């Protein structure tokens, strides 16, 4: 017997919702927002051969589909609550959907997210997730809050996902252990939700690094009307990537590689100790990489300093979906 859309939904995506008035099973969901909170909404689409390999592990893909959306809420300092999922599938493959749902729902349970609706249809493999969360009114972290004099910080390590992709496309050769370490960041990224929550009231601005450090930091600078300077030697790299810093492709991954899903944020200098404690409390490495400054005529909006103090020319980097 052919598996129907309703069979797939009922079998793999129906679960008891904790934060929902009415969830999966009706024409629409009903949710109730906490008093004094604002609703935070984001959505991301993942397309086969554009954002992931067609033969990608479905369980890892389920994890990643939700993780990249959780990362958006992390950058806003929001608590995740609800998600919707729309899937286009070439065929109703119950085994594939079962594995995908395992990855998706395991991460949803970890962050107490209710799946409250969605859709399935036949077509080229395409995944669209909408994520919703809550933040106390007026407390959301935003891109437009960076101020001259702020420190610039990033979480975790940068470049692993882009480095893994380069290796999988045979642009660089890595040892098996190095590839495993970097590929884990590509296929199953970690959303820094707890760090985002810890930064509320400390950070002036934040963004998640999905399209590369240079590209995403530029979004903050434009939105805030400021400039910045970062120290090349301060950028945090994993042990695997650090062993290849004699290669240009490693620096490209650090500065412009996508799929990091770390947080880049600015905070006042006076908050340095509190930022460090916040990172320790949620067990996330945080690294100060530079500073925010006022815009000066004749000076680039973003300066990158080499270890010898020389200013490096920054070309447009990062990932552009329409490039």
Task: Cite the ranges covered by each PLM segment.
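Glycine-rich anion-binding loops of enzyme active sites
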Residues: 33, 39, 46, 79-169, ...
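Glycine-/charge-enriched secondary-structure boundary and capping motifs
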Residues: 1-14, 57, 90-114, 121-125, ...
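General beta-strand structural signal in soluble alpha/beta enzymes
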Residues: 21-24, 40-42, 114-118, 153-156, ...
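Extreme N-terminal cap/leader segments of soluble proteins
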Residues: 1-60, 76, 81, 85, ...
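Small-aliphatic-rich amphipathic alpha-helix that forms the alpha element of a beta-alpha
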Residues: 59-82, 99-110, 194, 198, ...
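Internal active-site segments that recognize and position negatively charged phosphoryl groups
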Residues: 151-156, 188-213, 217
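A short, charged helix-loop
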Residues: 171-190, 243
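Residue-level signal for inorganic ion chemistry
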Residues: 30, 69, 77, 115, ...
């Amino acid at each position: 017997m052919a598996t129907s859309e309703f069979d797939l939904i009922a079998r793999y995506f129906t679960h008891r919702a904790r934060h929902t008035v009415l969830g999966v099973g009706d024409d629409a969901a009903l949710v109730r927002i906490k008093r004094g909170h604002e609703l935070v909404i984001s959505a991301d689409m993942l397309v086969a051969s554009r954002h992931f390999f067609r033969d990608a592990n479905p369980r890892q893909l389920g994890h990643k589909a939700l993780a990249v959306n959780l990362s958006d809420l992390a950058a806003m300092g929001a608590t995740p609550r609800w998600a919707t999922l729309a899937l286009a599938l070439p065929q109703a493959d119950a085994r594939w959907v079962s594995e995908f749902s395992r990855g998706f729902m395991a991460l949803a349970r970890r962050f107490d997210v209710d799946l409250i609706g969605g859709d399935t249809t036949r077509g080229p493999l395409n995944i669209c997730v909408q994520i919703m969360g809550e933040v106390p009114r007026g407390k959301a972290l935003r891109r437009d809050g960076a101020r001259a004099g702020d420190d610039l910080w990033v979480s975790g390590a940068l470049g692993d996902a882009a480095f893994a992709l380069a290796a999988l496309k045979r642009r660089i050769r890595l040892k098996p252990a190095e590839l495993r370490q970097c590929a884990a960041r590509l296929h199953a990224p970690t959303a820094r939700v707890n760090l985002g929550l810890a930064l509320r009231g400390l950070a002036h601005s934040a963004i998640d690094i999905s399209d590369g450090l240079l590209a995403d930091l530029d979004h903050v600078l434009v939105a805030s009307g400021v400039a910045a300077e970062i120290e090349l030697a301060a950028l945090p790299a994993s042990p695997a990537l650090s062993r290849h810093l004699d290669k240009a492709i490693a620096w490209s991954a650090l500065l412009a590689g996508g799929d990091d899903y770390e947080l880049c944020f600015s905070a006042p200098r006076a908050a340095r100790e509190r930022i460090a404690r916040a990172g320790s409390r949620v067990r996330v490495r945080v690294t100060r990489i530079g500073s925010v400054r006022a815009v000066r005529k004749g000076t680039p909006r973003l300066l990158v300093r080499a270890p010898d103090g020389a200013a490096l020319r920054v070309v447009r980097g990062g990932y552009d979906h329409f490039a």
